[in-house]
Regions:
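Anion-binding alpha/beta catalytic cores of soluble intermediary-metabolism enzymes, centered on
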Residues: 1-217, 221-282
């Protein structure tokens, strides 16, 4: 089995070293590569010496994102003047009632795009769906169990203060609704709905009451926020109030997988990001 090579520009950091040690014991397909600095790490990915990069325990998010943008590059499938890149978080928490023993949510964008317009929000939605689909496939392990397959099917809720028009007229509501319609037109296979309040998105009882005909209400596992302000607040709330473990930010839209660690990351946080990177590359 060929191993996935992840480069770490902060290779000598003790947190990184301990996370690598644990990850090597857990994941047989993982190989760590060191680099002197952020530029050299990105160059290693660009040259194919490494499959992906994890950085940020010492570097700022701005440094990681801009260096990756300039060296690794951003995909531009729609030939935009400024192609979109974004970031998602993978949230997990033990839940014995679920088919995989844990609750899982993917949140985008909570780290990169401050005030997305409709085109950017459309790209963020598709990029986050791609991340979710790859991660859920990794968790699925090609199972034929119907309950497991249903649980690990991406279902996108476009979050808002309003549910399907209940908030009246508002620019952000109109923007979100336009994105939902565009995704449905261009990717009819994707399960998506919105705009939608968080409780309607993830609580089956409330979802049935507020959006009875929705394909995702009450069972959403991919949450798209309208801007970075609300996204970062939700990300911190899920960690601090909800006791979820967050892996990320997982940068999206780049020519190779890149993850930006929080400078407050624990060793186990870093291990979670390593696992997420392995899932996205597998």
């Amino acid at each position: 089995m060929s191993k996935t090579r992840i480069v770490f520009p902060e290779f000598t950091n003790p947190y990184i070293q301990e996370a690598i040690r644990i990850a090597k014991e857990k994941f047989s397909d993982f190989e760590a590569v060191g680099a002197d600095n952020l530029e050299h790490a990105c160059a290693a990915v660009k040259a194919g010496v490494a499959d992906s990069m994890i950085a940020g325990i010492d570097y700022t998010s701005r440094e990681v994102i801009l260096t990756a943008r300039d060296i690794i590059g951003v995909k531009n499938p729609r030939n935009l003047e400024k192609p979109t890149f974004s970031a998602s978080f993978i949230f997990t928490k033990e839940n014995q009632a679920s088919p995989i023993g844990q609750s899982v949510f993917i949140l985008g964008d909570a780290a990169a795009c401050k005030h997305p317009n409709s085109e950017q929000l459309y790209d963020i939605t598709l990029q986050t769906h791609e991340t979710a689909a790859k991660y859920f496939k990794y968790l699925n392990h090609e199972s034929t169990d119907s309950a497991l397959n249903n649980f690990l099917t991406p279902r996108i809720a476009m979050l808002s203060f309003s549910t399907l028009g209940s908030g009246g007229r508002d620019e952000t509501i109109s923007l979100t609704q336009a994105v939902v319609e565009k995704v449905r037109e261009t990717h009819p296979e994707i399960l998506i709905d919105g705009e939608m309040q968080l409780d309607a998105a993830i609580n089956p009882r409330i979802g049935e009451k507020k959006a009875p005909n929705s394909p995702v209400a009450g069972h959403a596992n991919v949450l798209i926020v309208p801007d970075l302000n609300s996204g970062n607040i939700l990300y911190k709330a899920m960690e601090q109030f909800g006791n979820f473990t967050a892996a990320g930010p997982i940068l999206q839209g780049f020519n190779a997988p890149v993850s930006d660690l929080s400078r407050g990351s624990t060793v186990l946080d870093i291990v979670s990001v390593i696992e997420a990177e392995l899932a996205l590359i597998s």
